[in-house]
Amino acid sequence: RGARWQVQPDSIAAIKQTGVFQKLSLNNILGKIEGKNPSEIVIVGAHYDHLGIDPMLDGDQIYNGADDNASGVSAVLQIARAFLATGQQPERTVIFAFWDGEEKGLLGSKAFVQSFPEIKNVKGYLNFDMIGRNNNEAKPAHVVYFYTEAHPAFGDWLKNDIKKYNLNLAPDYRPWDNPVGGSDNGSFAKIGIPIIWYHTDGHPDYHQPSDHADRINWDKVVNITKASFLNMWYMANEKDF
């Protein structure tokens, strides 16, 4: 009887890993400035979740996520403050979004686009994910600027404003015909919403406890925030883009 269960050279076993399902409680945080034409909406967002704590690590066990993505969260907060400081009501409603669950697969932004009753009124989305580091110390002004290729105005805005306001940025312009990957911009691009995404590339501290605030290039964060405020101002007020 025992020989019946022996594995022979011509025996093949197929094992399929189905995974373990876990119920998560996630919370997106949204703020809004009502526009003169509230039937049209633009959104600026960044994910605020990170990796938490790993008690199995020796030494530093806390994943602080200074670049990924406190840098992006700070930009959204400052843009909201700047919109209010103008004292002007934008033409379109502006939503300021802080997404949960990005590190688990864009869960927060996916849930939003699937459940937001006015999603068809969203005309554009601007995303921040990791905007505070140098992947090459010889190029401290480097930033990758992804945008929907069918909307060349997005590229023109940044080029013009860098010259006009003397912003210390050296963008790598990457128009993308289907910008569905990388970060929360993908959730919006997949349903045809035009996007802009600021990103300063990877670095050795990515998803490591060493992603500390003292390694942030603060001048870069400030310049990206200034440029993206202008992006959002145009997105909220220009008739067409």
Label the model's feature ranges:
Residues 59, 82-105, 120, 128:
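Short helix-loop-beta-strand segments that form the rim/entrance of peptidase-like active sites
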Residues 85, 202-241:
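His/Asp/Glu-rich mid-to-C-terminal helical/loop segments that flank catalytic regions of hydrolases
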Residues 1-65, 81-88:
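Soluble metallo-hydrolase cores and metallopeptidase-like ectodomains found primarily
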